[in-house]
Structures are given as structure tokens and as C-alpha cells.
Amino acid sequence: MQYNTEDSVKYHYGAFPPKEIDYSLFISELLSATDALARYDQMLKNMHNNEILLAPMRNREALLSSRIEGTISTMDEIMQYEADDDGTTSVQAKSDVIEIVLYQRALKNAQQVLDSGYQLTVNFIKQLHQQLLYAGRGASKSPGEFKTIQNYLADKTRRKVEYVPISPEHLQEGLDKLMHFISDSSLPSLVKTAIIHLEFEALHPFQDGNGQIGRMLITLHLWMEKMLSQPYFYISDYFDQNKELYIKAMRNVSKTGDWNEWIRFFLEAVNAQAISNLEISEEIHNLYEEMKSEFV
């Protein structure tokens, strides 16, 4: 049975980067998100051993980003796999657990590579994708290779194509425009990050794993723009809780050309997630201090 392509949304050819942005429609959200992210980052700066203490948040980000992609697992399974793993990936391990652990490792490796002076380029993204899909179900989905046939985003239950990304024939041109935007745009960092995430998702350059790479780019780009002192910002929780709105706002860019609606949604997501991350970080820090005092 074939999928119905009637009324499917098509990629916005010729509409990237956006020609006009109306800041009056989201200036309040931009200020709130900037403030919330700054307060969260200050907490990171004041937290000793933050890489270790924020491990539970990092695990949850990998879990939720993979869940949005369709991967299902539990936190206990992830922790058990991490504890047992010796650096190699066992083919006996549960596939979805492997995918989530690989997400964590890919993000950590990306930080190390960028920290050494490497730039965010097409080759960097391909290497990130190769690490993400190294094993598990993704191993058969051409890790590190861009699509060569048209891909689709579909509602499998209704057998309906919801979105048609850019064609393979136009992909290189689309990626070149995205890389140029990343390196040359002078837009406010949060607005720029919103546009980068949307465009990568719209291009959907890989056979699989596009959403996870796209969400990694949010954290990595905010870090590169110096809005984060370290790449420890986890936004998938908000996207998971508001999945329908998340997808609708992204689709409307291609459907109606409304970048402002998407940017406003993204800023609301950053604001809400930064506040939540700050609260969780403070709880983790307080628990650490409490336990430390008990053992001194």
C-alpha cells in the first residue's frame, strides 16, 4: 500500500535564509530566554565538577531526544549499559539503549573536537552522524552519508506523507547555504540558533537520525556563540512535552513561510527549559553539598 502525498508540506525552496524577521513579534520572548539562559549558565560556572553532576540531565537528554526520534528505552537500562560497557558496543545489547548511549558519546566527542579549534562544517556533521549511528538499528542507515534518494516524514498509522524534505539533487546547495549562514550571520545568537535548527530539520540530509543531530546542533551552537560556558543545555524535554506544537511550528515555515512563529516557539522553549534546567541543577548541587558534608 502506498502513502498518500496529498496535502503534504514541501521544503521551502528559495526561502532560506529568511529575508525578513519581525522582532516585534517575539522581543519579549527573546529577552526572557536570554535572561533565563544566562542565569542557568551562571549556575554552571559556579558548580564544581559540573560534567559529573549533570550526568543525569545528559542521560535524560539522550533518552528524550531519542524518544522524539522514535527510540524507546528506560533510564535504568541506559545506566546499566554504561556501567557494563568496556568501550566497545555489544551486538547483544538492546538496540534502543545502544542508540541512546551513542547519542551521549557523539555529543561529548563533538565538544572535544570543537574545543580543539575545529569548525562546524559539513564534514563535522557527517562525522557526528557516523558516531551517532555507529551501531544498533542505525548501523544499516548509511552512517555519515547524506541521502541519495528522496526521504519523507510520514504518519505511518494513516499512511500519509506529512513532509517532503529537500531533494537529494538540491541538498548540497542547501547545506552550503546553511554553512554560510552559520559562519556569516550576525543575527542575535538565539534567533540564529532557532533558524539553524529549523533549516537542518527541513533539509533532513540523512536517511535517519536527523532530529537527534538537529537537537545536538542547538547546544553546540549556543556554546560556540558563547551563550553557554560549556555545552550542557538540554532542550529535548520541552520538545517532547510539546511535540505537536514543535512539529507544527516547524512545518509552518515550509507551508506558509512564517519564520516568526517558529522563532517565537523556539525562544519559549529555551526560556522554559533553561528555568527547568536551572532548578534541576540547583537540586543536584544541593544534594551534592549535603552528601559531601555527611562524609567530611
Model-derived features: where do they sit?
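FIC/Doc superfamily catalytic core
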Residues: M1-V296
